[in-house]
Every structure is written in C-alpha cells, then in structure tokens.
C-alpha cells in the first residue's frame, strides 16, 4: 500500500484525464479501494467540495467527511452543510473543533487574533485540528485545483504530504472553474449561496471578502495580510 513511509519505494498509479470527470472518479475509486476506511475527506463545503462529495458518494456512500469547524464560519456555510446532510444521509460528517474555544483563544492571545496574527489563528483553528483528525489515518482527500492559484499549480492526483506525514489525494486537479459549475448545475447540487454574491472562495467570515480580482478566485481571502493560504497546503 502506498503510504507516506513507502512513498519512495512504491510505484504511483497514473490516471487518464480525458474522460467526463477528468480522472476524478478513477482517482477516488482507486483511493477507496487502496485505503478503505483509512482515508478521510477534509472539506470546506465550498463549491469544489460539493462536487467532490457528490463524486465520493458514488464510490463510497458512507465515507468520512471532516469539516474544520473554527467557530468563525459564515451562517450560510453551516446551512450548506445541513443541505448536504439531507442529500447524502449515509456520509459521516465530522465537525472537528479546535481545542481552544474562541473565548479561551482571546484570553490567551488577545481579541480577534485573526486581525493581528492570522497565521497563528489558522494554525490553532485549522492546521492543528486537521493534524488531530488525520492521526492514525494514511491518506486524505482535498479539493485543490491547479487553476486556483500559483501555489496550487503543480499539485498532482497523488501527493506526498510532508505537512501531515500523509498521502494527499487531489482528484480535481484538471477541473476548471467552469467545469465545477457545469457539474453542479447538471447534477442540481446544493451549494453555498455566497458563491452567488461574489465569493468564489469561502473560508472564515472575518477573513473572507468578495473577490477583489475576478481573475483571481482567492483574492478575497485575508485581504491586506499578503496571505492566500491557511497553511493546510503549505509544507
């Protein structure tokens, strides 16, 4: 089995991406056969996440989905999660919370940490909780697409994840923004209504604005901080 420890020795599978799902369904089928219950999907419930959930449900209807519940998400995001639960009742959706409540974080590190040290806030409320969720897990699935940003342009279907000492599976690497929405409309999938209000990328409410640049899907994230990633996808 391909693991973080056996990465160098194991042969990596290849997948064609000239089919209807651009390889995504083939990648997911391989991943769940390979790892069975030893793989989770870390989902933010943005539109790419909805596509992946629908694809995953076709391969493993009772897959485990982890949502990093920072306590700072938009009301609309929580409503989206409820809609997903209704549509896919067999999925095991885990709401993973940080060890520190927002009140405890404020007491220890000051009010509104995201304003004066967003990297620390992301570490406490996203990176550490995901590391905890992946403890004992061999692989995890992510909705990264190469088109999303320069920092994601070289991601592969199967990646050695040095950050979490894991295997990271990215089925949507060849999908475009148009592909994502065509799939959502064709399948009539629920999605976060903030996408219709100028938010192509949605994270925590204090650190997410409508996109400043329509050609940069992540230009509304951490505006003014010179930051476009929460740290989950940076080694």
Swiss-Prot record:
Name the catalytic site residues: 230
Pathway assignment reads:
Sulfur metabolism; hydrogen sulfide biosynthesis; sulfite from sulfate
Matches recorded under Pfam families: PAPS_reduct
Q: Which named protein is this? A: Adenosine 5'-phosphosulfate reductase
Top-level taxon: Bacteria
Q: Which cofactor does it need?
A: [4Fe-4S] cluster
Molecular function as annotated in GO: 4 iron, 4 sulfur cluster binding; adenylyl-sulfate reductase (thioredoxin) activity; metal ion binding; phosphoadenylyl-sulfate reductase (thioredoxin) activity
Indicate whether Oxidoreductase appears among the record's keywords. yes
Q: Name the catalysed reactions.
A: [thioredoxin]-disulfide + sulfite + AMP + 2 H(+) = adenosine 5'-phosphosulfate + [thioredoxin]-dithiol
What's the Enzyme Commission number for this chain?
1.8.4.10
**What family does the database annotate?**
Belongs to the PAPS reductase family. CysH subfamily.
- Cofactor note text: Binds 1 [4Fe-4S] cluster per subunit.
The lineage is: Bacteria, Bacillati, Bacillota, Bacilli, Bacillales
Recorded GO CC terms: cytoplasm
Which keywords does UniProt give here? Cytoplasm, Iron, Iron-sulfur, Metal-binding, Oxidoreductase
Where does the chain bind [4Fe-4S] cluster? Answer: 121-122, 204, 207
Q: What does this protein do?
A: Catalyzes the formation of sulfite from adenosine 5'-phosphosulfate (APS) using thioredoxin as an electron donor.
List localization entries: Cytoplasm
Report which gene this protein is encoded by.
cysH
Q: Which organism is it from?
A: Geobacillus sp. (strain WCH70)
């Amino acid at each position: 089995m391909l693991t973080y420890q056996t990465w160098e020795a194991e042969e990596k599978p290849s997948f064609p991406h000239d089919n209807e799902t651009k390889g995504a369904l083939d990648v997911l089928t391989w991943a769940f056969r390979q790892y069975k219950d030893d793989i989770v999907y870390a989902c933010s419930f943005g539109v790419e996440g909805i596509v992946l959930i629908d694809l995953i449900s076709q391969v493993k209807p009772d897959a485990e989905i982890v949502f990093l519940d920072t306590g700072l998400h938009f009301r609309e995001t929580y409503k989206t999660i409820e809609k997903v639960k209704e549509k896919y009742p067999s999925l095991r959706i885990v709401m993973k919370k940080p060890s520190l409540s927002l009140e405890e974080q404020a007491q220890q590190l000051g009010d509104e940490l995201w304003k004066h040290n967003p990297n620390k806030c992301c570490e406490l409320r996203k990176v550490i909780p995901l590391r905890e969720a992946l403890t004992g897990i061999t692989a995890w699935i992510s909705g990264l697409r190469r088109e999303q940003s320069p920092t994601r342009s070289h991601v592969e279907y199967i990646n050695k994840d040095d950050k979490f000492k894991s295997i990271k599976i990215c089925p949507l690497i060849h999908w475009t923004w148009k592909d994502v929405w065509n799939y959502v409309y064709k399948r009539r999938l629920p999605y976060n209504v903030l996408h219709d209000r100028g938010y192509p990328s949605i994270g925590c409410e204090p650190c997410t604005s409508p996109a400043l640049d329509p050609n940069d899907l992540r230009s509304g994230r951490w505006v003014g901080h010179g930051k476009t990633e929460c740290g989950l996808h940076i080694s």
